[in-house]
């Protein structure tokens, strides 16, 4: 009995050993080959199979490239063709992403509610009267704001954000700087979303027409621009846009990086126009703000006054009348050589300066102390195009200033003394030449440039002590 059972088990075992594995069977191999080829499958199954194959090939190709390239980034990314599926998918993905980011932003009501929460849950500093909060208050306010506003405000109440602000002896921070930080973050994020929506090719850069569209969309929300005549809108957007490109597109490629725009002072200057009442802003401040309506109209009127023949562009003779004719002739010549676009010839005459080039010209003269303005002017001062100025260049440049100075009835000057004074002001690293880096490093580059191109600029430098006294006198008279 036991032996019979044992024989049966041994018989079954021997039978199992004789059965070949499924993978070695001919019909299994044929079936796998048949399925792998895709023959007999429906159209949907074939499409899915083909999609998997393509994705696998793309993955293997990228994996191989990344292994070969190591840490070297790719410098060129081919943009999808116009109207292609890739472009449509990219636009849809960008739209959904920007919509999601926009939904996460705090709106005006949310910001107002946050300010109320901050004020209701802070403590008053006995010494200064400032409203402050410690970390426990900070966490409590975070909970209250989350209940009233929602989870989208939670990211502003992180420990790292609390540590960013200056603390007093008790470890408290003022609520106003924190609230201003929240407002600025929301404002910049909203600006980035708006600019990204206008960025048609999604490369992180805006072209001039896209920048003008962005500014045009802001006009209804800027208190000081609401009364702008509709006919002036397009011209205003052009004038405002040019400042962004002057400072954010130094190589004049016709496109400005969105990140640079957001970090530039230009955007902050534009946002100053949010101030409701004009009483908060003096006439001087309005004139100094490039984006104010007063400034834009001034620049437009200036160009029209210079354009005697009403051709829409300026010749050298017309530009010489700028600033009451105080700019030197050699400087005007150099401006046309370096910054007026080639091929702009009117009625067989020499090149003429269009409105965009005129805006750059004005921006450079009004922002001489900035790296961008000084770079523009240095190209004009560099008579030989060598990247530096010699004593001979200084002599040639100042000779025209000297002539206008004498014609104005001023005392006689020694050009060599002025040249030596400029050298003392700049203190160049190489005693024989002045570079752009030297002018930027000495912090007086704008003054030096004014002395060499504008007789009024030299007069201001020569009378700087008297001008300082005049600025200090009015407060003394008022106090008396």
From Swiss-Prot:
Domain of life: Eukaryota
Residues in EF-hand domain copies: 186-221, 294-329, 369-404
GO molecular function, one term: calcium ion binding
Keywords tagged on the record: Calcium, Cytoplasm, Cytoskeleton, Metal-binding, Repeat
Residues annotated for Ca(2+) binding in this entry: 307, 309, 311, 313, 318
GO biological process, one term: regulation of dephosphorylation
GO cellular component: cytoplasm; nucleus; phragmoplast; spindle
Cellular compartment(s): Cytoplasm; Cytoplasm, Cytoskeleton
Record has Metal-binding as a keyword: yes
Main location, first listed in the record: cytoplasm
Tissue localization of expression: Widely expressed.
UniProt xrefs under SUPFAM superfamilies: EF-hand (SSF47473)
Stored InterPro entries: EF-hand-dom_pair, EF_Hand_1_Ca_BS, EF_hand_dom, PPP2R3C
Inactivation phenotype: Extreme phenotype with disrupted cell elongation and a highly compressed apical-basal axis due to disorganization of the interphase microtubule array and lack of the preprophase band before mitosis. Sterile flowers.
SUBUNIT field: Interacts with PP2AA1.
Function: Probable regulatory subunit of type 2A protein phosphatase involved in the control of the dynamic organization of the cortical cytoskeleton. Plays an important role in the organization of interphase microtubule arrays in part through the regulation of nucleation geometry. Required for the reorganization of cortical arrays in response to light.
Protein name in UniProt: Probable serine/threonine-protein phosphatase 2A regulatory subunit B'' subunit TON2
Gene field: TON2
């Amino acid at each position: 009995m036991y032996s019979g059972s044992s024989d049966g088990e041994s018989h079954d075992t021997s039978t199992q050993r004789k059965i070949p594995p499924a993978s070695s069977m001919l019909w299994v191999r044929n079936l796998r080959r048949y399925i792998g080829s895709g023959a007999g499958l429906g159209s949907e199954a074939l499409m899915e199979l083909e999609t998997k194959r393509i994705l696998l090939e793309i993955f293997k190709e990228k994996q191989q490239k990344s292994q070969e390239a190591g840490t070297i980034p790719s410098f060129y990314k081919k943009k999808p063709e116009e109207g292609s599926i890739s472009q449509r998918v990219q636009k849809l993905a960008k739209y959904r992403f920007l919509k999601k980011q926009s939904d996460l932003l705090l709106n005006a009501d949310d910001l107002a509610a946050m300010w109320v929460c901050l004020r209701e849950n802070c403590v008053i500093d006995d010494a200064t009267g400032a409203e402050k909060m410690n970390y426990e208050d900070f966490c409590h306010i975070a909970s209250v704001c989350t209940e009233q506003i929602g989870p989208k405000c939670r990211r502003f109440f992180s420990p790292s954000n609390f540590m960013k602000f200056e603390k007093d002896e008790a470890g408290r921070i003022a609520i106003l700087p924190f609230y201003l930080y929240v407002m600025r973050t929301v404002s910049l994020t909203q600006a980035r979303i708006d600019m990204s929506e206008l960025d048609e090719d999604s490369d992180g850069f805006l072209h001039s027409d896209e920048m003008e569209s962005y500014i045009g969309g802001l006009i209804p929300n800027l208190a000081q621009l609401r009364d702008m005549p509709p006919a002036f809108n397009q011209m205003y957007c052009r004038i405002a846009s040019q400042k962004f490109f002057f400072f954010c597109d130094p190589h004049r490629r016709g496109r400005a990086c969105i990140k640079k725009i957001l970090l530039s002072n230009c955007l902050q200057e534009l946002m100053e126009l949010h101030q409701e009442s004009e009483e908060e802003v003096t006439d001087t401040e309005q004139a100094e703000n490039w984006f104010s309506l007063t400034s834009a109209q001034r620049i437009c009127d200036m160009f029209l006054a210079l354009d005697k023949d009403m051709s829409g562009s300026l010749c050298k003779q017309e530009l010489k009348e700028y600033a009451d004719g105080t700019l030197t002739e050699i400087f005007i010549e150099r401006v046309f050589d370096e910054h007026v676009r080639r091929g702009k010839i009117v009625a067989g005459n020499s090149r003429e300066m269009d409105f965009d080039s005129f805006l750059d010209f004005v921006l450079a003269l009004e922002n001489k102390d900035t790296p961008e303005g000084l770079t523009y002017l240095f190209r004009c001062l560099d008579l030989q195009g060598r990247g530096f100025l010699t004593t001979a260049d200084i002599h040639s440049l100042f000779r025209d200033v000297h002539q206008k100075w004498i014609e104005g009835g001023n005392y006689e000057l020694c050009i060599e003394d002025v040249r030596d004074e400029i050298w003392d002001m700049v203190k160049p690293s190489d005693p024989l030449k002045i570079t752009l880096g030297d002018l930027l490093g000495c912090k007086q580059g704008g003054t030096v440039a004014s002395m060499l191109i504008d007789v009024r600029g030299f007069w201001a430098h020569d009378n700087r002590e008297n001008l300082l006294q005049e600025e200090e006198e009015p407060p003394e008279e008022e106090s008396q």
